[in-house]
A protein has these predicted regions:
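Conserved class I S-adenosyl-L-methionine
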Residues: 219-230
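Membrane-proximal basic amphipathic "stem/tether" segments
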Residues: 1-85
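S-adenosyl-L-methionine
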Residues: 264-307
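A short glycine-rich, Lys/Arg-flanked "PGG" loop and its adjoining helix->strand segment in the class I
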Residues: 329-341
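Conserved Class I S-adenosyl-L-methionine-dependent methyltransferase catalytic core
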Residues: 86-219
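A short SAM/SAH-binding and catalytic strip from SAM-dependent methyltransferases
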Residues: 312-326
Length: 408
């Protein structure tokens, strides 16, 4: 064992980690048929691969050839949306206003520049810069984590263990999508021919559990609406898994985030019909109009334009809790209004409110502060998020997974 440590573990690793603990996390992971030494080799190789990957700041993956004209269109839409001053419930909340200003400077500078080539270069590597993630700093969190040998070993082992558990707990069709693909150049753990990422697991899990909750395989001509869709990995997964089903996925988000979602969806689903604000701004947002598209991307305030009962299911994950309380109450009211009878609301959010001193003392409103006892609705699910998969970190942070069903 000592010889193996000396030969395989870099000097910095030996100097900074308690080796007994470091090696302990190897056992029980990797392939069940692997020998102990093979397991160790797999985990160590994965750690070193991620470290090398984190040092790469460029991306060899070329964007689709028509990206620049498409981004020029997105620039025009963004400029028009920013010139519109929404009513107070739809202005950026205190947490996001401060986070965008503080942690997404490079992305916002590219978005404000009007230079399509500059924005293209940012978006082609959006997983490796401040465009997305945990308030724009997910890649920095990952870099800091992999400076600590023991924490990085735990992270890698945890992802591999979750990967192996996934098909036993979730719908196995979604397992392939724990790999987020090539666009945006994600950084992940290489295993079983895939690149495993925490966000990939999260979105694959959401897609699986949402599909179960609404019995997706038995539905046709659905309109699904997500409030705060991020870079649109969840709709990508749902569209590719349920490719035999005809449905429309509507994303409502801040104007700053919609270009990322549009780029990602166009790159991954080039043949899909994507409806954007410039062609839907003035006309009605009736169900029949929405059904002309595979994806529809609209600014958050357009939720008021959706007719009563026009949506079959609404999704919100790790988003509403980041908003001010009056904004949350407004959105919950809108969700009740737009959801059709027999429809669903699927949400995963923090259960308890949390203050952020680094963001000027702004505070999240936890789900315990929301009123989800809606007349005519019943709870189909109310459990700690990741309970079945033992996603310990999120359980400790107090995230809950709730499904509400509106009576027919």
């Amino acid at each position: 064992m000592k010889r193996w440590i000396k030969e395989r573990i870099p000097r910095k690793l030996k100097d900074t980690v308690r080796l007994g603990q470091f090696l302990l996390v190897y056992f029980g992971s990797a392939s069940p048929a692997s020998t102990e030494e093979t397991k160790r080799d797999q985990i160590l190789a994965a750690i070193l691969s991620v470290r090398r990957d984190l040092n790469e700041h460029t991306c060899a993956v070329e964007p689709p050839p028509d990206t620049v004209p498409f981004l020029q269109r997105l620039f025009r839409i963004y400029t028009e949306q920013k010139s519109y001053q929404p009513a107070p419930p739809y202005r950026t909340g205190a947490i996001w206003e401060e986070a965008l200003r503080k942690w997404r400077k490079n992305y916002l500078a590219a978005l404000e520049s009007g230079n399509a080539e500059r924005l293209r270069d940012v978006l082609r590597c959006f997983h490796r810069n401040d465009t997305i993630g945990a308030i724009g700093i997910e890649i920095e969190i990952l870099r800091q984590l992999f400076l600590n040998p023991f924490r990085s070993a735990c992270f890698v082992t945890n992802l591999i263990t979750k990967y192996q558990a996934f098909p036993r707990v979730c719908d196995p069709r979604f397992l392939a999508f724990v790999d987020e693909g090539k666009f945006g150049c994600p950084v992940g753990v290489p295993f079983d021919g895939q690149k495993l990422t925490a966000s990939g697991f999260r979105h694959a899990y959401y897609a699986s559990e949402f599909s179960r909750a609404i019995d997706f395989d038995q539905k046709e001509d659905l309109v699904v609406c997500e409030l705060g869709g991020g870079y649109a990995n969840l709709p990508r997964i749902l569209k590719q898994v349920h490719n035999s089903r005809s449905f429309t996925y509507v994303i409502l988000d801040l104007p700053q985030m919609l270009p990322v979602a549009a780029y990602f969806l166009k790159a991954n689903c080039p043949d899909s019909r994507i409806g954007l604000w410039d062609e839907l701004r003035d006309g009605p947002l009736s169900r029949s109009e929405l059904r002309k598209y595979d994806f529809v991307l609209l600014p958050n305030w357009d939720i008021e334009r959706l007719p009563d009962g026009s949506v079959d299911a609404v999704i919100n994950t790790a988003s509403l809790a980041e908003m001010d309380r009056d904004i949350v109450e407004n959105y919950l009211g809108q969700i009740r209004r737009i959801t059709a009878r027999g429809g669903h609301f699927y949400t995963v959010n923090r259960d308890r409110g949390v203050e952020y001193p680094e963001l000027g003392g702004t505070r999240e409103t936890g789900m315990e502060e929301w009123n989800l006892d809606w007349p005519g609705w019943r709870k189909k699910m109310d459990r700690p998020s990741w309970g079945d998969l033992h996603w310990g970190a999120w359980e400790q942070m107090g995230y809950k997974e709730v499904v509400l069903h509106r009576g027919g």
